[in-house]
C-alpha cells in the first residue's frame, strides 16, 4: 500500500499502472495499456506494448550467494559491461551493444545500479534502461526498452518505470 501511495502522490506515475509481486516482495510501475505475456524458460515477468510490440519490460531474477552485495560484483560500469558480455551480447550473438551510462542509486536500504544501453539487434537500433539490485540471495535485473526512433518520446516515462522498481518487504 505504501508503494502505491508514495509513488502516486509524487505525480511520476501518470500513464503508469502498479504491479506488485504475488508474495508482496517487490513492486514497480509499467505503462498503461501494456500486456503481460509468459515465455517458458524466459524472464520472470515480461510486459509489452500492444501497439508498439517492440517496446518491452522484463524482470529477470537469478540466484546469487546470500552473502554477496551488489558492490562486490563491481562498479556500475563493470556490472553493466558484464551484462553486455554474458547476457545481452555474448560472443557470437551478432549483437552490438554500447553502455551509455551507469550510475549508483540507493533506495530503501538497497543499492541499485541504473544502466543505459544502445543496442543493434537484427539491424534494429534499440535503446534500453535497466536497473540491477541484489536482495536476499537473488539478483534482479529490471529492464525496459524500445526502438531508437521512439526513444525521445518515451525516455522520461521509461526512466520513471525503471526507477519505480522497489522492494516492499
Predicted features, each with a name:
Residues 23-40:
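Proline-anchored loop/turn motifs at beta-strand termini and strand-loop-strand connectors
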Residues 25, 73-81, 148, 152-156:
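Soluble non-cytosolic domains of exported or imported proteins
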Residues 17-22, 103-106:
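Short acidic-hydrophobic surface loop/beta-edge motif
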Residues 34, 138-169:
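Surface-exposed amphipathic alpha-helical segments
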Residues 4-7:
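C-terminal motif of bacterial Sec signal peptides marking the signal peptidase cleavage site
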Residues 9-11:
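Bacterial signal peptide processing site
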Residues 37-133, 139:
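Conserved polar/disulfide-associated segments of primarily extracytoplasmic proteins
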Amino acid at each position: 500500500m505504501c508503494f502505491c501511495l508514495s509513488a502516486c502522490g509524487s505525480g511520476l506515475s501518470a500513464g503508469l499502472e502498479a504491479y506488485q509481486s504475488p508474495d508482496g516482495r517487490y513492486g514497480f510501475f509499467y505503462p498503461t495499456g501494456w500486456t503481460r505475456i509468459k515465455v517458458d524458460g524466459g524472464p520472470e515477468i515480461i510486459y509489452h506494448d500492444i501497439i508498439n510490440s517492440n517496446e518491452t519490460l522484463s524482470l529477470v531474477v537469478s540466484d546469487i550467494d546470500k552473502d554477496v552485495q551488489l558492490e562486490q560484483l563491481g562498479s556500475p560500469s563493470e556490472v553493466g559491461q558484464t551484462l553486455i558480455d554474458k547476457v545481452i551480447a555474448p560472443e557470437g550473438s551478432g549483437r552490438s551493444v554500447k553502455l551509455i551510462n551507469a550510475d549508483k542509486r540507493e533506495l530503501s536500504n538497497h543499492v541499485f545500479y541504473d544502466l543505459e544501453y544502445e543496442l543493434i539487434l537484427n539491424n534494429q537500433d534499440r535503446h534500453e534502461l535497466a536497473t540491477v539490485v541484489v536482495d536476499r540471495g537473488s539478483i534482479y535485473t529490471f529492464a525496459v526498452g524500445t526502438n531508437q526512433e521512439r526513444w525521445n518520446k518515451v525516455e522520461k516515462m521509461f526512466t520513471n518505470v525503471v526507477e519505480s522498481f522497489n522492494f516492499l518487504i
